[in-house]
Amino acid sequence: MTIQKGIITLTILIFISGLLTAFLLLDDSHLSFFRAQQNQRKHYVERTLQLQKMTATKKQTACLDLPLNNNESVKQISIALEGSTDAIQYFLWCERMSLFKKSPKKGDNQGALKDFVTDEKLAYFRPHFSSPPRILNANKMPKLYWFSDSQAEVEINGTVSAVLIAEGDLKLTGKGRISGAVITSGNLTLDGVTLAYGKKTVVALVQQYSQWQLAEKSWSDFNVQDE
């Protein structure tokens, strides 16, 4: 009986020892898993803070670097850490500010200034206008000329690729040709000058007189596909 009790006691002790060993191993596994989670969370927070600082810096100029030779009005751009293997990204929305409400579809747009030009954007773009000389000579690079006088007159010499915009009346004299478009608030008079719609010239200048800017409340950490 004494031997049997000893065997039973030893068996119980071995069983308890095994349970304790298993518990310790399991507890160590839990600790390792917890440590790994903590390290991963710490790494994520550090990367996120780093990306936030970079986004705050880049958002000032990110939209300005977008190309103008397209017809897009909104654009989403992503910012990510270089060499990063994780999927942490921030997204910014850029919107396009344009002088033109729409692109002219014909050469003669007499009396239609308000239909094409955005008044509230005029102050921003006015410093970029080319000062109109008294004589416009043939050119290869399209230009936009803005006439602010109530009555303006200009001589056209050769083929001029341009968009002419007048806040009042505009008289074109000479023996030249306008390839592009003319937009006036008042009357348009052609004295020996021919006017032909130049699509390439118009499209190029409409795109040129626009500017990408950061949209309000556009900073997000999720992606939205362009429609």
Swiss-Prot record:
Location(s), subcellular: Membrane
Record's keyword terms, sorted: Membrane, Transmembrane, Transmembrane helix
Superkingdom assignment: Bacteria
Pfam family, one: DUF2572
Transmembrane domains' residue ranges: 7-26
A GO cellular component annotation in the UniProt record: membrane
Its membrane topology: Single-pass membrane protein
Protein name: Uncharacterized protein HI_0940
